[in-house]
């Protein structure tokens, strides 16, 4: 019992020191958990898409002043050319423009700053993003937009957004034709709330489409099987 008494007294007299040690240990464990969680988050970046092992982004590698440069900017027709060249390996392709950052959109007199991008009818199926409402073929028509679930809550509250009109920069009316699931935080497209039909880009001359210039597009390819990737590596002539 004396031993227990002395141990008890020691703990009582040094309780402040023990408390600091416990707090320090707790903080250390918490920080470790946060670090591990962040590492896991980064290692799982862009794995949020359905069957992400089959999803690829097209990279452009070119030589400029004897320096090799890599870019995800491609010419508009590149994705379709790959699909035509490898019909047995490619399930679908999509082409986007991603430079509509922090664009002003208006519902009546209310302004909403949103990140937007263009997309074609294969946008959602190629990326593996769930479509909550609407027909993706609507993206073949100009002046059409699909909006995220989060934007529906922000702009329309309890109203049905389908058929409603939003104005881009207060000037260009766009009709809401669909709703898609929010891009998660570990996605390169996180924060994108509006997908504008690529047909709108053609109508309003937002970018050149051709093989002799206009590399402001980002292209994605979804393969039928992940192991087909090595067969579709496209190399530019040296």
Q: How should each PLM-predicted stretch be described?
A:
Residues 35-102, 203, 212-222, 226, ...:
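Membrane-proximal extracellular/periplasmic loop immediately following the first transmembrane helix
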Residues 1-5:
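Short, membrane-interfacial amphipathic segments enriched in basic
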Residues 6, 12-43, 53:
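Short, strongly hydrophobic transmembrane alpha-helices
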Residues 8-10, 44-45, 74, 165:
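Membrane-interface anchoring determinants
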Residues 7, 26, 38, 78, ...:
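Structural preference for long, well-ordered alpha-helical segments in enzyme cores
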Residues 60-71, 94-122, 132-145, 169-171, ...:
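Short acidic/polar micro-motifs at solvent-exposed secondary-structure junctions
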Residues 119-133, 145-238:
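Mid-to-C-terminal secondary-structure elements
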């Amino acid at each position: 019992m004396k031993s227990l008494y002395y141990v008890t007294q020691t703990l009582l007299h040094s309780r402040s020191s023990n408390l600091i040690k416990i707090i320090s240990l707790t903080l250390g464990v918490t920080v470790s958990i946060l670090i591990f969680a962040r590492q896991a988050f980064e290692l799982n970046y862009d794995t949020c898409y359905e069957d992400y092992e089959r999803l690829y982004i097209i990279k452009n590698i070119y030589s400029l002043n004897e320096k090799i440069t890599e870019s995800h900017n491609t010419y508009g027709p590149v994705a379709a050319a790959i699909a035509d060249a490898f019909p047995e390996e490619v399930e679908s392709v999509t082409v986007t423009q991603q430079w509509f950052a922090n664009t002003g959109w208006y519902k009546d007199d209310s302004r909403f700053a949103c990140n937007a991008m263009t997309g074609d009818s294969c946008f959602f199926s190629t990326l593996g993003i769930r479509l909550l409402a609407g027909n993706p073929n609507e993206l073949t028509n100009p002046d059409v937009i699909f909006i995220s679930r989060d934007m529906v809550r922000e702009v329309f509250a309890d109203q049905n957004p389908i058929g409603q009109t939003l104005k881009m920069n207060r000037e260009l009316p766009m009709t809401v034709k669909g709703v898609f699931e929010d891009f998660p935080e570990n996605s390169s497209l996180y924060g994108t709330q509006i997908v504008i039909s690529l047909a709108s880009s053609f109508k309003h001359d937002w970018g050149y489409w051709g093989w002799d210039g206009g590399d402001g597009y980002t292209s994605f390819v979804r393969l039928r099987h992940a192991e087909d990737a090595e067969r579709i590596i496209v190399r530019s002539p040296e």
